[in-house]
Amino acid sequence: MEEFDKKLEQYGILTKNAQKSIEKDRVKIFNNAIIETINFKTLQEKGIKELHIKKSEIYNIVFSKENDISVCFDECLILKQINAEKLLFKNKFNFIKCIFHEKIDFSYSFFSTTCIEENVSFKECTFKFNVFFNETRFETHVNFEESTFEKQVIFNNASFLNQETEINYIEVSFLGAIFKDRAYFYNITFKSMIDFSYAIFENEVHFCNTYFESVVHFSFTKFKGVCDFSNTKFLATQKKEERNRICFDDTEFEDIVHFYSAKFESKVLFCKSVFKSKVNFNGAEFSTSHYDDAEINNFDNVTFESDAWFNDIIFNSSVLFSKCEYKGNIYMRNITSKQQLYFYESLFLSNVYFNNSHFKDYVSFCECEFEKTACFYGVKFDKTPNFSQAIFKG
């Protein structure tokens, strides 16, 4: 029977016929190695500072309680589950274009590095089984760009705490990621700038009770299942120089959407988005940011293909609902608008209800078209509204 490589065995790596390069504090393995076990405790005891494995099959990865090795797995197959709960990772931790065949679990672990170049990356990876990052703490840049999650992914109660002062610097990226099963992001704190642009959620996704304290982008994202942002806070208190801080522009929602009691404390963009099913903004609040009281929330050119609820909303900042197409019933009852609202050139194809709402500032329905019932019962306008060239057919 073929024996393990004696040299690598000294470093806690059990493999056969591996092409390797071993320097003073570096180990590299490449080109179709079959690795039975990697033991990080032994590697660290041997003084290894950097481990790079490329195009290999790996069965067992055994991390140490504290891991300070710079790690890069490049185009590898990870064939056994990874159990890495309650561990500390102090250095670069990269899996690039890897395929994980079984569960990975980094719950309750802590990722912390001291410089921008040393980050956590699972870029372009494929996860064939469940992924767990429950209560994981990230104090570094995190990259899941263009990765595919074929089963459930759970980040509940995780914290993304890294903050850079540079404008447009993405600190947490799920750009172009694909979620084929349910995704859970409950009770998360994002102090980092995060980007889900061009991501595809093919099943349910939940961001309930999550805090976005920095810039957040969902531009050109596709939500194919139920999407829940209930009780989520979009604070965007970090990176105040960033022009667009909360972005859902050109986004497609195919199933029911919940923004119930969500709070937007900075300008939010929904322009050119499409809601193909019911959407619920009941009890939401749109506030003026602390550093720009002239901001305007933008729902320009949005298409609502089913019923939409905006009841009991407080608009503390101006909102554009211009050039929208409302195909289902629209409910904007009991809203309080303290700033200007613009609905000009919008098309209401079904019933719309503004019952008992209070518009404390200017509101424009200029050139709107109401095909059915438009109910303004009990509405109070503190300033003269603009209905010029509006058409009422109901």
Model-derived regions: residue spans:
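N-terminal leader/targeting and pre-domain segments
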Residues: 1-394
